[in-house]
Amino acid sequence: MENFEEIINSKTPTLVDFYATWCGPCKMMSPLLEQVSKDVGNTARILKIDIDTNRNVATQYGIRSVPTLILFKEGKQVWRQSGVPSKNLIMESVNNFV
């Protein structure tokens, strides 16, 4: 992914969803992240990364299971969660860094 480093280095917190098209739990994340996106508006960004088409990025961040969410703020990893967390947990984590 060409602009990945630029995006995660911005001042706007960026929640990255590392997923795979064949992953059942990953499919459950999409509607959840759509709700989170509506709730956070422009205060945070949500980015989806397919680990099968972006293997270098997945390897760089040690993604071993999907879905994995990583929240970046100014290039630093500030929160990480594997599996399907609750919307409340995601919102709480994002709101801590906006």
Predicted features along the sequence, with ranges:
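A short beta-strand-turn-helix
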Residues: 1-13, 55
